[in-house]
């Protein structure tokens, strides 16, 4: 494999026989002696998109059969965790002051069986003071209602803050164009839906946390677990067995996984958790969710010379990976396969009362492709030419030396 590239190289697959015959071993399949007599955790989730928590009543749930413990953020002593991308957007692993999307964990029930924990979770009553739910990006940008009061705005990140000089007024940027056309595109939100839902199991062995997790990024997960458990990486043994699909969403580490260690320590026995398909749809990080404003300009004979893209990224209710990753991956792919000499890309990330977004199959790159291809169609329609012919005129010419696009990508 010359230069480490798989292009033009036959790649032998070695992992298939196990999955086609005896089958893989996934996080919920793990049968380790250290997990003997494991209790089962089920999370109580918000049924509202946005609201202040007035009270959490667990009294009736504590009387349910098989219940071993019920915890809230207060009983676990959880402190707010600040986002590295926007410190003012801090939250606890279990919602404490208010809930910010449907499905956000509010409390956790630990019982002898999963069914007992599920039944008891139904008996936890949360009283809310309802707040306006922001589910539309443009509405969230204009609204006085804030997802995070301390942030001061629902726009929690903008590439202009990094000093990227890509915010030229349109009338100036497109001044030399014979033709300009604008568009507003919505690259819709998607849920990853891997065949294997999230699952995890935790136990303590000689003062060391041992935890199995379905993850695409074991080292990143190790960092998250270390931060959540006192900062001693040597005190954590994280194991990732076979993973039944993730599509990017399992790169993140989630509250439900991070809380199992403290629950197991408090209970003095192993604790397991497996989400339902409904929970996966609500809480496993979503993808895409990008609103795109495009302006494309050029000559009447079909040469595109200028292109501006302002991408509004829906971060969901948490300022996490989706806030940064997708927008940053959109920018370098903005030109697509076309030789467009003048390109500006600005991205703004906005929090809403929806499931947080994260990496998903390409993470910003397919969004960039969709934007430029739709813009090319608009341009072709405006000048009355065949879209295929307009594309042909603007394709990057055959090159032998490295080619650098207007957004800095080297081919």
State where each predicted segment sits.
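Short helix/loop capping segments that flank catalytic or ligand/cofactor-binding pockets
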Residues: 29-30, 52-54, 80-81, 117-120, ...
């Amino acid at each position: 494999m010359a230069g480490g590239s798989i292009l033009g190289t036959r790649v032998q697959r070695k992992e298939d026989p196990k999955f086609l015959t005896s089958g893989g071993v996934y996080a919920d399949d793990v049968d380790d002696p250290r997990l003997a007599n494991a209790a089962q955790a089920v999370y109580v989730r918000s049924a509202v998109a946005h609201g202040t928590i007035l009270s959490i009543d667990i009294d009736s749930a504590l009387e349910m059969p098989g219940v071993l413990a019920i915890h809230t953020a207060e009983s676990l002593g959880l402190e707010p965790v600040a986002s590295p991308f926007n410190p003012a957007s801090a939250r606890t692993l279990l919602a404490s002051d208010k809930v910010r999307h449907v499905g956000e964990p509010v409390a956790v029930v630990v019982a002898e069986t999963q069914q007992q924990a599920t039944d008891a979770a139904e008996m936890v009553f949360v009283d809310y003071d309802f707040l306006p739910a922001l589910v539309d990006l443009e509405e969230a940008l204009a609204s006085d209602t804030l997802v995070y009061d301390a942030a001061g705005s629902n726009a929690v990140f903008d590439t202009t803050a990094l000093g990227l000089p890509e915010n030229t007024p349109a009338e100036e940027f497109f001044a030399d164009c014979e033709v300009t056309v604008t568009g507003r595109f919505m690259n819709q939100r998607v849920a990853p839906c891997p065949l294997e839902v999230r699952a995890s199991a935790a136990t303590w062995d000689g003062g060391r946390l041992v935890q199995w997790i379905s993850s695409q990024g074991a080292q990143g997960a190790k960092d998250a677990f270390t931060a959540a458990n006192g900062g001693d990486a040597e005190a954590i043994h994280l194991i990732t067995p076979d993973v039944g699909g993730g599509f990017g969403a399992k790169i993140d580490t989630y509250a439900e996984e991070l809380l199992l260690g403290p629950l197991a320590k408090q209970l003095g026995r192993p604790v397991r958790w497996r989400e339902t398909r409904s929970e996966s749809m609500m809480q496993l990080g979503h993808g895409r969710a990008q609103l795109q404003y495009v302006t494309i300009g050029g000559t009447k004979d079909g040469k595109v010379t200028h292109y501006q893209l302002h991408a509004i990224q829906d971060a969901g209710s948490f300022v996490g990976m989706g806030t940064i990753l997708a927008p940053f991956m959109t920018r370098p792919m903005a030109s697509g396969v076309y030789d467009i000499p003048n390109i500006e890309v600005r991205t703004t990330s906005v929090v809403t009362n929806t499931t947080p977004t994260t990496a998903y199959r390409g993470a910003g790159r397919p969004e960039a492709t969709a934007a430029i291809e739709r813009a090319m169609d608009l341009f072709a329609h405006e000048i009355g030419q065949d879209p295929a012919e307009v594309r042909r005129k603007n394709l990057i010419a055959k090159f032998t030396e490295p080619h650098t696009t207007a957004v800095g990508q080297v081919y």
